[in-house]
């Protein structure tokens, strides 16, 4: 349900979705408020929405973010040796080009990094992470659809 939710994956490989409203036109949207998404143990797929707090837990987790985020998600335990970040951008317009993705130190919060996608901060990463651009993959929405990566957007919640 939409609202402030806490989703816990527990042991095993889980899919956690922090989006409400699913697909909007050709791409994912998020009308939900902040959620807490904790993958627990296992290799999890966590799709973050706006203002969500993401804790992957142990295992090799894949964190998915994108242009649907209007308030930065907070990632509190990203481990670049194990985890991966995947950013989806909307290429439905013929003139669309991949947005610039930039990682920089947060000037207001020591020890935190900001991840910018175009002119929007989509993630705040805290902790001892040494996140850099090599840890981020960028994929178009059409490619994500072809790979069925956007299928989980149709049913918010834990799976």
Language-model segments: what does each one mean?
Residues 68-70, 79-94, 129:
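Acidic glycine-/aspartate-rich tracts in secreted/extracellular proteins
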Residues 54, 71, 92-94, 121-123:
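Short, surface-exposed beta-strand-loop junctions and turns on beta-sheet-rich folds
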């Amino acid at each position: 349900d939409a609202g402030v939710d806490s989703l816990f994956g527990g042991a095993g490989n889980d899919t956690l979705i922090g989006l409400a409203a699913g697909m909007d036109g050709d791409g994912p949207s998020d009308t939900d408020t902040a959620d807490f998404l904790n993958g627990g143990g296992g290799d999890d797929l966590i799709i973050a929405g706006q203002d969500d707090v993401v804790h992957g837990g142990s295992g090799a987790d894949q964190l998915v973010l994108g242009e649907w985020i209007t308030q930065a998600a907070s990632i509190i335990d990203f481990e670049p040796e194990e985890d991966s970040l995947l950013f989806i951008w909307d290429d439905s317009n013929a003139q669309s080009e991949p947005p610039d993705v930039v990682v920089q130190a947060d000037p207001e919060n020591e020890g935190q990094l900001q991840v910018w996608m175009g002119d929007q901060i989509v993630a705040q990463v805290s902790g001892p992470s040494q996140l850099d651009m090599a840890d981020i993959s960028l994929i178009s929405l059409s490619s994500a659809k072809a790979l069925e990566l956007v299928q989980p957007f149709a049913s918010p919640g834990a799976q």
